[in-house]
Amino acid sequence: MKIIVNFDFIQQELAGKTDVFEVADGTILGDLLRMIDAKIMEAGKNKNIDTTYKTTLAGSQLNGCVVFINGSAPEKMLEHRLHGEDNIEFVYGFCGG
């Protein structure tokens, strides 16, 4: 299924403004965030940019951000099951500390 991700200004220099991720049915948000972080870290490595404060996760918790799915923050954020065409947005002040 396709999940639309809108990156926050903190991430945009590494991930672009928007991307579409293809994930398996039943994927949870935590798994998608790990995929996103891998993309951010690879881009940071290629551009020689520190990604410590640009990733979505710090260990097994959110890295200072709020994640909205279709306009609202789910209660059990990292365990939330995604659905096709979900729209993910990051709100910083927040992601990356």
Predicted features by range, described:
Residues 1-96:
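Ubiquitin-like/PB1-type beta-grasp interaction modules and other compact soluble beta-rich domains
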